[in-house]
């Protein structure tokens, strides 16, 4: 039995997220369907996590087991021939038997993209959040510093989050300015549901002057008591890389 590790890139616009859904087409369903056609057998993927509807990925990691002896290149080339244009296999490699990306992962890197143009852009609307008006980047960066380290992020999760603990370690929150485009890179050991999007929505409120960096500091000092800002929309978020 072989275990194959895939690195997947996808545009999540037209999907109900990564995970199989009773109502709605998921990325997992599409990739498993392509694998079943390629290998002539049913396949169940083990993923490094899940992305919500509309969220993208450049480095989703998934693994599966198979007895087939086809070359690695045939996995990537064969799948890419069967997958739709908005999903692609970036690489296929042998992994240790039974490798499970979810439990083996030691960290993730997410990137959130904000479009700050005076007018909305049809060309970037599916990969960014259009935020009108000036943003105070110095205040946003000061607020971001309060979100690094091992902290209780109870204020930064969606109501449906079922995580047993809200303690997470965030290694870095980096805000980069490239003219009309602003990127927020978040590196950490793991994240609560919608945590990165709530962090970004909160930082934008700081940039608009509606919240202060000190208010953000209180969100992790008094978790679940001091409310966070709004949840940024899904289309600006992309899973860049999973660390092992």
Curated annotation (Swiss-Prot):
Its EC number is 5.4.99.12. It comes from the Bacteria. The active site is at residue 52. The keyword Isomerase applies. SUPFAM superfamilies: Pseudouridine synthase (SSF55120). It holds the Pfam family PseudoU_synth_1. GO terms for molecular function: pseudouridine synthase activity; RNA binding; tRNA pseudouridine(38-40) synthase activity. It catalyses: uridine(38/39/40) in tRNA = pseudouridine(38/39/40) in tRNA. CDD domains: PseudoU_synth_EcTruA (cd02570). The keyword Isomerase applies. Keywords: Isomerase, tRNA processing. GO terms for biological process: tRNA pseudouridine synthesis. Substrate binds at residue 110. Coiled coil: none annotated. Transmembrane segments: none annotated. PANTHER family: PSEUDOURIDYLATE SYNTHASE, TRNA PSEUDOURIDINE SYNTHASE-LIKE 1. Homodimer. Belongs to the tRNA pseudouridine synthase TruA family. Formation of pseudouridine at positions 38, 39 and 40 in the anticodon stem and loop of transfer RNAs. This is tRNA pseudouridine synthase A.
